[in-house]
């Protein structure tokens, strides 16, 4: 009986891992079908802007770790974030381990993943479940 339970737990964990990995892309495809094409880079900019405005408005400086292909776009978008008017200074660094849809924001408060995949996992509760070690 314990072997059967162990196999079931393993199978559920494997299925959850596959779902967690593939669900964000599936949601993007469904949204594209419903709303038409959109630029994932624009979504990344919106996610970063949203996080900075809502959570890091009082921070002195934040650093965005992004894929090399996103550096120029994000630098243009956040050129006005210079540390004045309660906006943090935004510094951008390349991280070769990140995909074009990923971004990690580092600040004096800690770091947080801001990419579309990370937001969907958080919204769907995958991160909470992973932290708790539950299935």
From Swiss-Prot:
Keywords: Cytoplasm, Nodulation, Plasmid, Protein transport, Transport. Pfam families: T3SS_SCTL (PF06635). One of its GO terms (cellular component) is cytosol. It comes from the Bacteria. Signal peptide: none annotated. It is found in: Cytoplasm. Disulfide bonds: none annotated. GO terms for biological process: protein secretion by the type III secretion system. The keyword Transport applies. PANTHER family: FLAGELLAR ASSEMBLY PROTEIN FLIH (PTHR34982:SF1), YOP PROTEINS TRANSLOCATION PROTEIN L (PTHR34982). Belongs to the SctL stator family. The core secretion machinery of the T3SS is composed of approximately 20 different proteins, including cytoplasmic components, a base, an export apparatus and a needle. This subunit is part of the cytosolic complex. Component of the type III secretion system (T3SS), also called injectisome, which is used to inject bacterial effector proteins into eukaryotic host cells. Acts as a regulator of the HrcN/SctN ATPase activity. NCBIfam families: HrpE_YscL_not (TIGR02499). This is Type 3 secretion system stator protein. It comes from Rhizobium fredii. The lineage of its organism: Bacteria, Pseudomonadati, Pseudomonadota, Alphaproteobacteria, Hyphomicrobiales.
